[in-house]
Each structure stands twice: as C-alpha cells, then as structure tokens.
C-alpha cells in the first residue's frame, strides 16, 4: 500500500455523518475497494457519504486544503488507481423515487440499476440500463451510458432531465437545460470533470417486458456466425439491438452449465417489441450455424442481466474499446484472426465483442450534450481477467495487438466509460471530438480551475 503523505487537518470532516477512515484503520479496505480489483486504491482519507450534505462538507474541505478528490459508487469503472487525496464513496446513497405520472425517477448518487429496476417495475417502467444492473447509475450516465436497448432509445444521457451536483467550490447546484445549462451539457457525456453528482432525474420508459438472450455456437463456427450477423445488421429495424462476441469462459461455478468452461461464438439480442416479430427477425441467426445453447426468450425487463450474463462478483479486469466506422469483410477477418479459434483456446481475453450501433444512437439528443459516439456504425470492446502478474501481461499484450490490428477500421475515438486505463492527455481526449474536448477543458477551467477532480478520465483545465 502506498504510504500516506502529509495531510491537512481533518477536523472539518468530523461534521460528516458517514464514516471517515484513514489507511491502517479496520474499515479502510471495505471503504475504498471497488468492483474492478485490478485497481488498488490508496487514498489518504476516504469518506462514506450518506447524503448531499456530506459531499458538500467533503468538497469544501478539499477546496480549502487543495486536496484532490476521487468519487466511487460501485467501482465498475475503476480502471485507474486512486492514490493519495480524498475518496468519496457514495455507495450508501441508494434512494430511488419513481413518479409514475411523469414517468421519471430521482436517483441518488450510489444507486445501482438494480435499485432502479426494482422501483420502476411495479409501474411497468424501466430505465436505459447497460449490460449489468449491478453497475452504478450516475457514473454510467455521466459517461453517456450505452444501453442494451440503445439502438431503440439512444444513450442514457439523452433521457436525463436534471442533476443535483456539488461543484469543486463546495456549492450545491441544480442543473438542467434552463439552470446552469453549460454544467448540464458537460455532465451528460463529459464524465465527472466538473462536479460530484448527488442525484439525477431521468425519464423512464414503458418497458415491462422484452425479447432477448443469447444464441451460442461453438467457436469453430465463429466466422459463419459473424458474417451472417454483420450482413443481418444491415437489414434489421432500429429497435433490434445486438452484439457479436467471442467468449472463453472459465470453468467456475458462477457460469451456468453448459456454457461453463466453453469456447463460444455468441450473438446477444434485445428486442423491445412484439416477441413474435422478434422471433422472426432473429431467424437468420438461428439458422446460420449449429446452435448449442439458445437463451433467447420473452422476459421481464428487470431480468435484463440474463442477456449478456456479466460477472456479478468483483474481479480484476482490463477493459478497452474502440468505435468503428464500419465492419467490412477484411475487418471481420482481422477481428477473428486476433480473437477467434486461430488465436488458441488459451488466448487471455475473456470476451471480445462487436456491438451494432446506429438507430437512435446516431440521432442527436433533444438537448445538446457531450456524447461523441453518434457517428459509429459498430463498437468493439474487450475484457481480460488478470488474477496474477503473468496473466496481466498476457492480457495487456493481447489487448494491444487487437486494437492495433483493428485501428484502420476505427473512427479514432473511444467511449469514456469503457476506454480502459487512461493514458496521457492525447489518449484521454480520444473519448470526445476535438471540439467537445476543448469545450470540456474550458468548462473544467470554470468549475474546477484547481483540477481537484483529477482522477480517472479527467480533462485538463484550459
């Protein structure tokens, strides 16, 4: 663990209702550890915020003492170590209030999508969740939020109506299209560069049920399934959402039989319309190659986790992504050369995927935001598990090879939530267009001129 350096007096933090812990104290590890165990956090002090007042107190102390600040709810996006400074843990702030009349939800900073689903489902409503309901709502949305049903409804940031946010000067602000509009712009897609969100209000959708799941073939059929899927994506309605993946699943109890320990090619689909129509639409995928496991069925929207079967337990992971301008045959060939059967069963990436973009994801938000993935036709992402240093190095090498090989087909940009470990300023800027990045840097200089919020995917004040 990194030794703490000299810290300013902590007396002001005694006003915080939640715990305040330092390295060496019994509760420290639980307070700072996130879902992604690849990043070891060693802040000099961590607070467990119980509400907006705690965050205001913490930010005023940080501003007065020039202490850098990091924020974590679930830690799914923890692709960087938090060293020194102050960590604000919002995981205790899980309140969700659903207004069925306005079809909106007010969601506190630490709430997971599972909390939102549970509160919204009795009203026949749902939010634009990503591939795991275990992820935090706020961090996901600040990065734009790429939903499972994105082609049908757009980015999660598009549905946000307002934020309550504490800016680095310690002021609690309300931000919407009419009040603090520039702050509202930067918070939707600009990640946590201009403040610490205490809650947001977002629209919900009347989505009680959907038709979805995965069509799994043995990996020897990956080429046939990929080419069929790619051609099929040019024919389907905007509401059909899908992703092709190559999966090397470990033989662990958390993975259900018969998928456990297998090497698979999979197309995951999600269709919010009539199940009979969805069944007809995916027929070409079921006919493309011998299907070993088919989990596609009508389900409650709250059961969305069954579609992509993301891990539910913390693990050390390396994730990365790339926006693709298209997916021509040579791009498919390159992808499979890197991750398919030819790469070997011992290839270290757990999953490498190609997601169909377009549809509502390509349409501008009704209110301008900082999301910069609307021009991508496809989206590539990968995850490697790193339980030990030799495996970690193999994962890093495989990741570099994959993204170098696929670079000719990319737009040159990433998505901030799945960007992976942020590098230098040039690398960080790849999550946005040059124009949006410059605007974010300007906003950073207005709201956070001292760069207190400097951890993770942080831009530089102009």
Spell out what each predicted region is.
Residues 1-462:
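Soluble FAD-dependent oxygen oxidases
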């Amino acid at each position: 663990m990194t030794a703490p350096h000299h810290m300013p007096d902590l007396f002001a933090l005694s006003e915080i209702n939640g715990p305040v812990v330092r390295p060496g104290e019994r509760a420290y590890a639980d307070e700072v550890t996130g879902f992604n165990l690849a990043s070891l956090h060693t802040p000099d002090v961590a607070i467990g915020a119980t509400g907006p007042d705690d965050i205001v107190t913490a930010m005023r102390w940080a501003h007065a003492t020039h202490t850098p600040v990091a924020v974590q709810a679930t830690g799914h996006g923890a692709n960087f170590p938090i060293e020194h400074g102050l960590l604000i843990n919002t995981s205790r702030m899980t309140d969700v209030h659903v207004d069925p009349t306005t079809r909106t939800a007010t969601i506190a900073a630490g709430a997971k999508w599972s909390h939102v689903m549970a509160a919204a489902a009795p009203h026949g409503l749902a939010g634009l969740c990503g591939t795991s309901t275990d992820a935090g709502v706020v961090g996901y949305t600040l990065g734009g939020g790429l939903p499972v049903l994105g082609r049908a409804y757009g980015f999660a940031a598009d549905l946000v109506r307002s934020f309550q946010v504490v800016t680095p000067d310690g002021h609690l602000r309300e931000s919407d299209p009419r009040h603090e509009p520039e702050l509202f712009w930067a918070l939707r897609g600009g990640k946590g560069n201009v403040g610490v969100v205490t809650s947001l209000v977002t629209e919900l959708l009347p989505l009680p049920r959907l038709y979805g799941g995965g069509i799994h073939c043995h990996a020897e059929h990956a080429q046939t399934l990929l080419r069929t899927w790619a051609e099929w994506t040019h024919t389907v309605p905007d509401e059909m959402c899908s992703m092709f993946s190559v999966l090397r699943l470990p033989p662990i109890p958390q993975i259900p039989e018969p998928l456990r320990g297998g090497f698979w090619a999979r197309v995951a689909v999600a269709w919010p319309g009539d199940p009979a129509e969805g069944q007809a639409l995916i027929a070409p995928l079921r006919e493309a190659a011998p299907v070993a496991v088919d989990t596609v069925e009508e389900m409650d929207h709250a059961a969305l986790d069954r579609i992509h079967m993301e891990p539910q337990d913390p693990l050390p992971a390396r994730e990365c992504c790339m926006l693709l301008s298209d997916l021509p045959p040579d791009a498919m060939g390159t992808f499979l050369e890197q991750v398919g059967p030819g790469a070997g069963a011992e290839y270290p990436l757990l999953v490498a995927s190609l997601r169909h973009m377009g549809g509502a994801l390509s349409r501008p938000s009704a209110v301008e935001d900082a999301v910069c993935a609307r021009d991508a036709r496809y989206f590539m992402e990968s995850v490697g598990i790193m339980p030990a240093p030799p495996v970690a190095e193999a994962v890093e090498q495989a990741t570099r090879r994959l993204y170098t090989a696929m670079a000719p087909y990319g737009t040159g940009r990433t998505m901030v939530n799945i960007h992976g470990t942020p590098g230098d300023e040039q690398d960080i800027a790849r999550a946005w267009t040059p124009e949006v990045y410059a605007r974010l840097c300007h906003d950073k200089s207005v709201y956070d001129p001292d760069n207190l919020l400097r951890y993770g995917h942080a831009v530089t004040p102009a």
